[in-house]
């Protein structure tokens, strides 16, 4: 990438390694479900993680050390992040469509009732309600970090980011415990399938968002962000707020109404 108002990138191997990694990971994971292909899956995972690390390292170099991220470049990245979150909204919309398609007009195969016969749904006022409070609190702390960063208060920004990462990890642990104690599985009719797919993909997004925030915390500690140049943090915060909103819809529709 050269220094000019527009986003002109240099030659990079990472799109190629990333696409190869995605292919190997998909093929390997599909094969792993049939008891083979574990090595292919590990190779794909390694390539994806390596590409993520190296590509983000290059972007950080361009923005923090070389000063290539002008206002026009930053605007383009903001538009890209907005489009990415829009695609994620469509992704989760498909799961909610599947859920309501099955729940609003239950098939006779599941007893013409929702939840299906012999399915004991989780109590929405136990772990799910605690997880809701945790994610809402994490949304407050990440906003606190953002305002502290814009105000030049490095200590408060760091402390609030630590709290956000801890809350994200705590949510993941509680979700894993909920899965282990659930009285039904993903194989228990369309209810189990839609429940675990929707909440499982949300849990994956929480893990991804926690990794984003952890990287931002590390960059805060080495003073990569300034009061007016911190889009990496803003993108992670947008993603985290998106995860919060999806969870509120999941809790309302699947845990509370669906039970």
From Swiss-Prot:
**Alphabetized PROSITE patterns for the sequence:** COX3 (PS50253)
Query: Its catalytic activity?
Result: 4 Fe(II)-[cytochrome c] + O2 + 8 H(+)(in) = 4 Fe(III)-[cytochrome c] + 2 H2O + 4 H(+)(out)
An example of a GO molecular function for this protein is: cytochrome-c oxidase activity
One annotated Gene Ontology cellular component of this protein: mitochondrial inner membrane
Pfam families per the record?
COX3
Q: Where does the source fall among the domains of life?
A: Eukaryota
Q: What class of enzyme is it?
A: translocase
Enumerate the Gene Ontology biological process terms: mitochondrial electron transport, cytochrome c to oxygen
Which parts pass through the membrane?
Answer: 13-33, 36-56, 80-100, 125-145, 154-174, 195-215, 237-257
Query: Which keywords appear in this protein's UniProt record, sorted alphabetically?
Result: Membrane, Mitochondrion, Mitochondrion inner membrane, Translocase, Transmembrane, Transmembrane helix
According to its UniProt record, the EC number is 7.1.1.9
Localization, per the record, is: Mitochondrion inner membrane
Assembly description:
Component of the cytochrome c oxidase (complex IV, CIV), a multisubunit enzyme composed of a catalytic core of 3 subunits and several supernumerary subunits. The complex exists as a monomer or a dimer and forms supercomplexes (SCs) in the inner mitochondrial membrane with ubiquinol-cytochrome c oxidoreductase (cytochrome b-c1 complex, complex III, CIII).
Membership in a protein family: Belongs to the cytochrome c oxidase subunit 3 family.
- What this protein is called in its record is Cytochrome c oxidase subunit 3
The species this protein belongs to is Heterololigo bleekeri (Spear squid)
Taxon lineage: Eukaryota, Metazoa, Spiralia, Lophotrochozoa, Mollusca
């Amino acid at each position: 990438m050269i220094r000019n108002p527009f986003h002109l990138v240099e030659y990079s191997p990472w799109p190629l390694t990333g696409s190869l990694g995605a292919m190997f990971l998909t093929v390997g994971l599909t094969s792993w479900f049939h008891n083979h292909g574990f090595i292919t899956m590990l190779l794909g995972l390694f390539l994806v993680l390596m590409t993520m690390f190296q590509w983000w390292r290059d972007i950080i170099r361009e923005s923090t050390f070389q000063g290539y991220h002008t206002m026009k470049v930053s605007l383009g990245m903001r538009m890209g992040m907005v489009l990415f979150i829009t695609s994620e909204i469509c992704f989760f919309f498909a799961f909610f469509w599947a859920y309501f398609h099955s729940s609003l007009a239950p098939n006779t195969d599941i007893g013409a009732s929702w939840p299906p016969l012999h399915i004991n749904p989780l109590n929405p006022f136990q772990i799910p309600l605690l997880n809701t409070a945790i994610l809402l609190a994490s949304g407050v702390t990440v906003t606190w970090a953002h305002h502290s960063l814009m105000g030049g208060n490095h200590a408060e920004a760091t402390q609030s980011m630590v709290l956000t990462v801890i809350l994200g990890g705590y949510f993941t642990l509680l979700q894993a415990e909920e899965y282990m104690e659930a009285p039904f599985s993903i194989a228990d009719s369309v209810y189990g399938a839609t429940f675990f797919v929707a909440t499982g993909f949300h849990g994956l997004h929480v893990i991804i968002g926690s990794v984003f925030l952890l990287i931002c915390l590390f960059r805060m500690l080495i003073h990569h962000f300034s009061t007016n140049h911190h889009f990496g943090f803003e993108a992670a915060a947008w993603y985290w707020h998106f995860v919060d909103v999806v969870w509120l819809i999941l809790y309302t529709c699947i845990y509370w109404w669906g039970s």
